[in-house]
């Protein structure tokens, strides 16, 4: 059989094939067996029929290839024969009579290294007249392109090495797959090397478009094009992606806004050796959480890390001893998904890969490995890894040039059509079945592939909304997460804070007794108490685990904090209180901003101790905010954008040694007295007693009352021989003046040991019960509680 040159002719008017090369047909060799066949039938413009079959070849020579059989049934009117001419070639292959003489046929064989491509050809009769399709077009068939499978979504590799692509799009009337031979922005241009238009009759099942390619060798990335608009769109399910590039190209003629795009990589992340890694699976009540931003945690040169490790997952791993020294056993990472670098991590583009910039090489495959390394290091040190996730909105814009992925693929399915009143962001239709599946698949991916231990869902109120913005009593997404066999083994936390409007209001959340919540009321009430603006009953409620919010779940489901990344840092909370900060309930302790007044500085230090003390002696999960242990400041700004990287030089100062030492003491205290502070259930009412300064009833309804004492009787475990533990007596004084507090009577032979007095100098304002210098105070005696001071006593037998 004669050799037939046949240049690749991609659909969609792509100007070139792979590298501008040519596909060469060769005679079929004997002994070749045809593998799976794809058959096509065309009607011709002279009312005839042309049948084409494309098969893979498996030869005993191991070469493999593709066979294309062209057959024209019936010979009437074709007595002079027919010639097949490929587009772009002057040569032709004659069609010979098939067995039985009832049809004319030709068989071509193609080099497999050129697949995938499209074979485009015409037929000519003996007179030279061209025969085309009934639409007056060339006959065109894909080679190395199969129907594919609708599952799984995204790119996947089948057992025979074929690459399957699948994307959900209910409303697209046309879908194309773009393959690129060079990375976007890498000098090779943004136009695809090959475009494959998907046939809705072959490549569509329900609302899923799919196609299979025998090989993608020579290509580096891919994208989808939907609805006939020539704009590459990122596969929502891509696991390895390129960088988000801001650059206009042929797709963006006439646009005024910066154009953003990102292509999915055809690379496969190497399998990861997890070794003996196991989820710590710590009980909720035993958690001590540290919220951190991956980049800002070690980005500053003061971290002492190499440039390629600073601000990365590797940098986080390098500081694991810092977490251990604080007594932290869970880190809560701000969103690590690819995000808008101006708006910040709470405006994601994608949900299946970590941010490329969080790796030393700035590449997706490197980021994947670095994150897994970090998780393994944390687990080895008994520390869980929790992720903040944003599934309520994305950074995709309304304009076409800001359409990056789901908005262009199927806007009406993935997004709420008109958004939500007062919100300009692209709001995801979370409870739509398709978006719900995307979110569930993403969460499972992070658990199964990255060994993540749990998730904190930012902007949780939006997760309970329907397509019209209405509130749902049983949101399908939340219910599915709650009872999912994989996700039900993780920690799931709802956070009401919204990065869209910076609101942070507690709301009735459908929890199924499984969801924990970030307790906004805790922060508000503690701040107001220390500022002398709250009823002491509000403080008492928070100390006991916020029974008004978690009565059906227990105190362990309350994630407590006194500061967070979206507001004032802890040191700013006691240094700034101008009119713009009224919602923060902060107090500057007598002077705004930086001060050299020793009295002001002393009060600020005392207030920092008080905040930390109340955080750790309250029932619930304490959450530390990055930098609060070292006086990290944003100069009084509440804007997320004004936060800077952590300054590690400060770790050597006396102030930081004092604060970090106090935190370590408090975490150890919580662990030692887990019978009181690490409880799944609330304290028994009969074991809690409240007093004023002279052991009388507190002034619950007196707005001027700023002093409260709490006596907690230790529960005795009759099953344990050494279960006798001492009572606790805690005094909280937010007054400007000192108060003389009477201590409750004790059994004969017992004394009160003062473990904490936040007014004393360092070292000495905190001590363990085994410290021989700890102050002993007999029962029914009085203790002088200074202004703005918290004091903790523990009873112990004087003979012990």
Curated annotation (Swiss-Prot):
One of its GO terms (cellular component) is chloroplast. It comes from Oryza sativa subsp. japonica. This is Isoamylase 2, chloroplastic. GO terms for molecular function: isoamylase activity. Its EC number is 3.2.1.68. Disulfide bonds: none annotated. InterPro entries: AmyAc_plant_ISA2, GlgX_Isoamylase_N_E_set, Glyco_hydro_13_cat_dom, Glyco_hydro_13_N, Glyco_hydro_b, Glycoside_hydrolase_SF, Ig-like_fold, Ig_E-set. Its main location: plastid.
């Amino acid at each position: 059989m004669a050799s037939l040159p046949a240049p690749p002719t991609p659909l969609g008017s792509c100007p070139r094939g792979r590298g501008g090369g040519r596909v060469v047909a060769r005679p079929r060799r004997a002994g070749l067996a045809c593998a799976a066949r794809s058959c096509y039938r065309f009607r011709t413009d002279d009312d005839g029929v042309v049948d084409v079959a494309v098969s893979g070849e498996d030869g005993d020579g191991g070469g493999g290839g593709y066979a294309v059989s062209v057959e024209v049934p019936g010979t009437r009117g074709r007595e002079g024969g027919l010639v097949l001419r490929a587009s772009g070639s002057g040569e032709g292959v004659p069609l010979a009579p098939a067995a039985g003489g009832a049809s004319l046929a030709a068989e071509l064989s193609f080099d497999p290294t050129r697949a995938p491509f499209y074979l485009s050809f015409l037929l000519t009769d003996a007179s030279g007249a061209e025969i085309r399709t009934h639409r007056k077009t060339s006959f065109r068939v894909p080679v190395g392109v199969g129907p594919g499978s609708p599952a799984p979504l995204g790119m996947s590799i089948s057992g025979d090495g074929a690459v399957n692509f699948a994307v959900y799009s209910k409303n697209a009337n046309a879908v194309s797959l773009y393959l690129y031979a060079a990375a976007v922005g890498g000098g090779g241009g943004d136009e695809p090397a090959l475009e494959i238009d998907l046939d809705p009759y072959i490549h569509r099942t329900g609302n899923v478009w799919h196609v299979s390619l025998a090989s993608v060798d020579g290509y580096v990335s891919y994208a989808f094009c939907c609805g006939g608009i020539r704009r590459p769109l990122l596969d929502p399910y891509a696991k390895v992606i390129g960088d988000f590039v801001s650059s206009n190209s042929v797709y963006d003629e006439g646009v005024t806004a910066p154009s953003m795009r990102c292509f999915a990589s055809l690379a496969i992340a190497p399998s990861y050796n997890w070794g003996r890694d196991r989820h710590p699976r710590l009980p909720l009540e035993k958690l001590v959480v540290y919220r951190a931003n991956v980049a800002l945690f070690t980005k500053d040169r003061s971290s002492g890390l190499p440039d390629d490790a600073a601000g990365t997952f590797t940098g986080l791993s390098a500081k694991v001893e810092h977490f251990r020294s604080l007594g932290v056993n869970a880190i809560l990472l701000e969103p690590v998904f690819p995000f808008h670098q101006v708006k910040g991590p709470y405006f994601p583009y994608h949900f299946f890969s970590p941010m490329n910039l969080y790796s030393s090489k700035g590449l997706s495959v490197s980021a994947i490995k670095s994150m897994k390394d970090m998780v393994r290091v944390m687990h080895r040190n008994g520390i869980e890894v929790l992720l903040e996730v944003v599934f309520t909105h994305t950074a995709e814009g309304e304009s076409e040039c800001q359409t990056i992925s789901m908005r262009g693929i199927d806007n009406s399915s993935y997004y709420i059509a008109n958004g939500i009143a007062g919100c300009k962001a692209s709001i995801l239709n979370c409870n739509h079945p398709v978006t719900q599946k995307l979110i569930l698949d993403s969460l499972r991916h992070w658990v199964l592939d990255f060994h993540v231990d749990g998730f904190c869902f930012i902007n949780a109120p939006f997760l309970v909304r329907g397509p019209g913005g209405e509130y749902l009593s049983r949101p399908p997404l939340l219910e599915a997460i709650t009872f999912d066999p994989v996700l039900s083994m993780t920690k799931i936390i709802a956070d009401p804070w919204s990065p869209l409007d910076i609101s942070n209001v507690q709301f009735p959340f459908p929890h199924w007794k499984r969801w924990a919540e970030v307790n906004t009321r805790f922060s508000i009430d503690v701040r107001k108490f220390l500022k002398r603006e709250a009823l002491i009953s509000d403080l008492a409620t928070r100390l006991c685990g916020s029974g008004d919010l978690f009565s059906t779940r227990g105190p362990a489901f309350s994630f407590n904090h006194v500061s967070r990344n979206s507001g004032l840092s802890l040191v700013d909370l006691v240094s700034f209180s101008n009119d713009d900060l009224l919602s923060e309930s902060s107090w500057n302790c007598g002077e705004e901003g930086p001060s050299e007044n020793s009295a002001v500085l002393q009060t600020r230090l005392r207030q920092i101790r008080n905040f930390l003390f109340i955080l750790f002696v309250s029932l619930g999960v304490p959450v530390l905010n990055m930098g609060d242990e070292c006086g990290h400041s944003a100069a009084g700004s509440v804007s997320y954008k004004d936060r800077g990287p952590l300054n590690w030089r400060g770790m050597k100062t006396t102030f930081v040694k004092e604060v970090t030492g106090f935190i370590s003491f408090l975490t150890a205290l919580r662990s030692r007295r887990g019978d009181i502070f690490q409880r799944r259930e609330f304290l028994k009412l009969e074991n809690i007693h409240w007093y004023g300064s002279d052991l009388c009833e507190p002034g619950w309804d007196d707005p001027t009352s700023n002093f409260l004492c709490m006596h907690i009787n230790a529960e005795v475990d009759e099953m344990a021989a050494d279960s006798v533990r001492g009572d606790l007596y805690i005094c909280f004084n937010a007054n400007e003046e000192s108060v003389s507090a009477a201590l409750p009577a004790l059994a004969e032979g017992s004394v009160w040991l003062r473990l904490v007095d936040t007014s004393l100098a360092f070292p000495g304002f905190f001590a363990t019960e085994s410290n021989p210098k700890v102050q002993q105070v007999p029962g029914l005696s009085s203790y002088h509680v200074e202004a703005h001071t918290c004091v903790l006593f523990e009873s112990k037998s004087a003979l012990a």
